[in-house]
C-alpha cells in the first residue's frame, strides 16, 4: 500500500503528539507503522528528485551532503531557541513533562522537569517570532481603526463647518 507523502505529517502529528489523559490509544499499530515506513521509503526515493529544486533556491548545502559535523551542529543549537526534549531520558515516549519559568527569567522558554536530562538531546526554537508577527498584525489593525476614526471625525468636522 503506497501512501502519499502529504499524509505523513498529520499521521506523525497524531502519533507523536504529547500524551494527555485524552490521548488516543492505538491497540493495533502495525498497519500505521507500516504506512509510515512506506511513506518514509518513498521520501527517500524522491530525495534525489528534490535536490535540483533545492539547489535552484540557492540553499548553501543540504544537511545530508555536509559532513562537517560539529561546527554546524553547534551553530544550529545556538540559532534555535525553544527547548524540546528528545526521546532520551524521561518518563515514557519523549519526556513530555515541562515546567514554565517566569517570563522575566526566560521569556518564552520551556524546560524539562528533570534536571538530570541529557543536554545533548535538546534544541530550542524561538517563540518570539510568532509573538512578533501577532504584534505586527495587531498594530496594522489598530492603524486601520485609527484611520477609520480619523476619516469619520473629518467628515463630522466638515459637516459642522458647513452648518456655521
UniProtKB/Swiss-Prot annotation:
Biased composition (Basic and acidic residues): 110-120
In-chain residues carrying the UniProt-annotated modification Isoleucine amide: 160
Stretches for region Disordered: 58-120
Subcellular location, principal: secreted
GO cellular component, as recorded: axon terminus; extracellular space; varicosity
Localization in the cell: Secreted
GO MF entry, a single one: corticotropin-releasing hormone receptor 2 binding
Keyword hit for Hydrolase: no
Pfam family of the protein (one): CRF
Record text on subunit structure and interactions: Binds with high affinity to CRF receptors 2-alpha and 2-beta.
Database matches in PANTHER family: UROCORTIN-2 AND 3, UROCORTIN-3
Family that this chain belongs to: Belongs to the sauvagine/corticotropin-releasing factor/urotensin I family.
Name of the featured protein: Urocortin-3
Lineage: Eukaryota, Metazoa, Chordata, Craniata, Vertebrata
Amino acid at each position: 500500500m503506497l501512501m502519499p507523502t502529504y499524509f505523513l505529517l498529520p499521521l506523525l502529528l497524531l502519533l507523536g503528539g504529547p500524551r494527555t489523559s485524552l490521548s488516543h490509544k492505538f491497540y493495533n499499530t502495525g498497519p500505521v507503522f507500516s504506512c509510515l515506513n512506506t511513506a518514509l521509503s518513498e521520501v527517500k526515493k524522491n530525495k534525489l528528485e528534490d535536490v535540483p529544486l533545492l539547489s535552484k533556491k540557492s540553499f548553501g548545502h543540504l544537511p545530508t551532503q555536509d559532513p562537517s559535523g560539529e561546527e554546524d551542529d553547534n551553530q544550529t543549537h545556538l540559532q534555535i531557541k525553544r527547548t524540546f526534549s528528545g526521546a532520551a531520558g524521561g518518563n515514557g515516549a519523549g519526556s513530555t513533562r515541562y515546567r514554565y519559568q517566569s517570563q522575566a527569567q526566560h521569556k518564552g522558554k520551556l524546560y524539562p522537569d528533570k534536571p538530570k536530562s541529557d543536554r545533548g538531546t535538546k534544541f530550542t526554537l524561538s517563540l518570539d517570532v510568532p509573538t512578533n508577527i501577532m504584534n505586527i498584525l495587531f498594530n496594522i489593525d489598530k492603524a486601520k481603526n485609527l484611520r477609520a476614526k480619523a476619516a469619520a471625525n473629518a467628515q463630522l468636522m466638515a459637516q459642522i463647518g458647513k452648518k456655521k
